[in-house]
Each structure stands twice: as structure tokens, then as C-alpha cells.
């Protein structure tokens, strides 16, 4: 009886633990972009591609995190151009920049070129890469670190 109670207590404690942040990093596959866009129909959002190995991505993530803190209504979607095995690190890095609660994805295709082609035929994989979607889902793509005034201007024009 003692062992049964102890076992049930362990199950209760384990079941009460929060889901790990890595579990919140979804696999980005061929249909993921369409799903992301469809869920935000008529709403502006930023779609930011980055990688744990990208030298300039921390600057971008820091700026996005600061903007998110000032404007909690801004919808940011992060997609890491890494592998699902790196999900714990991806979640940890995003959280360290104040982006732990934004929607997160990670490339989950053996051929990332196929995903990049579906996302944007003109994109060759340079990172960071950010897509600004306005309310009508007009899209502006920008490679490289986006200056903070540019981000603030987009937020002012699109986030209410």
C-alpha cells in the first residue's frame, strides 16, 4: 500500500510539472507557413527566421524582445532554421531575449532548401530574415538585422 501511494504521489507531481519550453517549439514543415498565415488572417505580424548559430541573430532577437516588452500586443512568430534536436536551446535562447511566450517553430525537414523555397523563392538562407505582414497581409521581406527605428515604425503603423 505504501508503494502504491508513493507511486501515485510521484505521478501527481510529475503531471503537475509545467510543459517544457522545448515542447512549445513546433516542427516547421512544408504546410506550416500556410497555417501560420491563415491563423492571422487580417492581423499584422512579424515572422522572424533565425538560428542558434547565426552571428547577427542575437541583435535581432534582442530588438524584437525589447519591442515586445514595450508593445505586448505585437504578434511575433519565430522560426529557427535549425533542427528539432536543438529545440531546448532554441526555447532557452528565445526566452533569454524576452521571447519565450511567442509562437516558436523549428525547421523539421531533411531538406531545408525546400522549406526556404516555399517561404520565399528569392530567399537563399541568409539570417536573420524577417517578414513584415501588414493587416492586408502585404509582405515586406528584410534580410539582416533590422534597425530599431524601422521596427518601431512598423509597430506604430500596424499594431493597435
For every predicted segment, state its role:
Residues 59-97, 112-115:
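Structural microenvironment flanking redox-active thiols in thiol-disulfide oxidoreductases
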Residues 6-18:
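Bacterial N-terminal signal peptides
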Residues 51-55, 81-85, 109-112, 137-139, ...:
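Solvent-exposed loop/turn segments at secondary-structure junctions
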Residues 39-55:
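Short active-site neighborhood of thiol/selenol oxidoreductases, capturing the structured segment around
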